Amino acid sequence: MDFLLPDFTPAYPEIFLLLMVCVVMLADLFAGERNRYLAFYLSLLTLAGCALVTCGIYSTEVRYTFTGMFVGDAMSDILKLLIYVTVAAVLIYSRSYISTRGLLKGEFFSLALFATLGMMVMVSANHLITLYLGLELLSLSLYAMVALQRESAIATEAAIKFFVLGALASGFLLYGMSMLYGATGTLHLPELAKVIHSGQADHEIFIIGLVFVVAGIGFKLSAVPFHMWAPDIYEGAPTAVTLFIGSAPKFAAFGFVMRLLVGGLGDLVTDWQGMLVLLAVASMAVGNIAAIAQQNIKRMLAYSTISHMGFVLLGFIAAGENGYSSSMFYVIAYVLMTLGAFGIIMLVSREGFEADKISDLKGLNQRNPWLAFMMLLVMFSMAGIPPMIGFYAKLSVLQAVLEAGYIWLVVVAVMLSLIGAFYYLRIIKFMYFDAPEQTQPIMFKPDVKVLVSINGLAIILLGMFPQMLMGLSLSAIQHSM
């Protein structure tokens, strides 16, 4: 019997990354204590190699492999490139932080790369099992990363909470997927869409399955009422891990929603739109209101994330190419702002001191004016003040929602954004108008200063000239639908 090998081309980046993870682990095993940075540089080299491979196979044509379970298209390739850049930035920001806290070891970098592999699989999944495998690879890596600082009781507690709630969410998702399979007899997303479109299956079973699927998605996006894990994990995890959790996985979550809700369950749009409206409004309300009361800056940014995810969901509610592309643009803007915020928090932290309270930023302008200015740009952008990228991201989503006819939703979103501006501007007040509690100057390596500068510059320039990034998002959506 002849055995035909599948065309591995769409999966070349994943195969390359998997091989390089093995190299990183072996190199770290034999490197010894004096060469601990070897795993760091190999990880950056791996991400650069993945980017080159992805660019080499990039095409606007849709390519399938592994009997249609894995897909390569413009959206998956662009999301993967964004994931590589984000993970590389996280590693550079985190280098000094993890070095002074005993986390500069191969396990940290191996887990980060395995999590990256999970994200890549998620954005290229064309099958419910592939989606779930990518999600679990990402989730299990993140659980281990949170618990990596074994001597920290709060980190261990956060990891246990993350694991238990994550397992519950995975159960919801699996149950929903099993209902969809029971109703259609297929796990392939295109086949699922065909059966739904034909109207052959029982609509009630679809709705039950859809409820569980949306609940699982809500957890992964930290949307209310499935947000309980986010504040505790953001606060309890080492800041480097918090930055990782709060940045790159959002691209994977966006790809997950696009593949499952839009690609597989697109004909049920009127059903899942109603569910997403509830999640979006609740997320924006709870996130913005709860953030006001926080004194811990990591918890505040966790609630901020919840409110931002509400805006991301608005793009899916608007539907259509404009809605989905504005949602993708918002995710890019959010990740850019998150990198800047947590990167600066890690720079303010030092050995034996964690800058995890809002008051720790008091007088930052006197200690390091340049760093304070970068944080000011990030906070202005998060608040949605022009000409920052955060303003245009909010504007593009609201325009799409308005075009879809949800005028009341636009009014609610604007009102809740105004409430949210308070806690962002409060940080600026602490940095510029309060006396510093710490007088020690803030020192860091030149490459980190360059990265923060690029981060801040991108927030301004992409806000003033968003056409290229918006066009990229629109192109990715058009070629994947």
UniProtKB/Swiss-Prot annotation:
InterPro entries: NADH-Q_OxRdtase_suN/2, ND/Mrp_TM. Signal peptide: none annotated. GO terms for cellular component: plasma membrane. It is an enzyme of class 7 (translocase). It catalyses: a quinone + NADH + 5 H(+)(in) = a quinol + NAD(+) + 4 H(+)(out). It is found in: Cell inner membrane. One of its GO terms (molecular function) is quinone binding. Keywords: Cell inner membrane, Cell membrane, Membrane, NAD, Quinone, Translocase, Transmembrane, Transmembrane helix, Transport, Ubiquinone. The chain crosses the membrane at residues 11-31, 37-57, 74-94, 103-123, 128-148, 162-182, 205-225, 238-258, 272-292, 300-320, 328-348, 371-391, 405-425, 457-477. Its EC number is 7.1.1.-. GO terms for biological process: ATP synthesis coupled electron transport. It is a multi-pass membrane protein. NDH-1 shuttles electrons from NADH, via FMN and iron-sulfur (Fe-S) centers, to quinones in the respiratory chain. The immediate electron acceptor for the enzyme in this species is believed to be ubiquinone. Couples the redox reaction to proton translocation (for every two electrons transferred, four hydrogen ions are translocated across the cytoplasmic membrane), and thus conserves the redox energy in a proton gradient. NDH-1 is composed of 14 different subunits. Subunits NuoA, H, J, K, L, M, N constitute the membrane sector of the complex. Belongs to the complex I subunit 2 family. This is NADH-quinone oxidoreductase subunit N. The lineage of its organism: Bacteria, Pseudomonadati, Pseudomonadota, Betaproteobacteria, Nitrosomonadales.
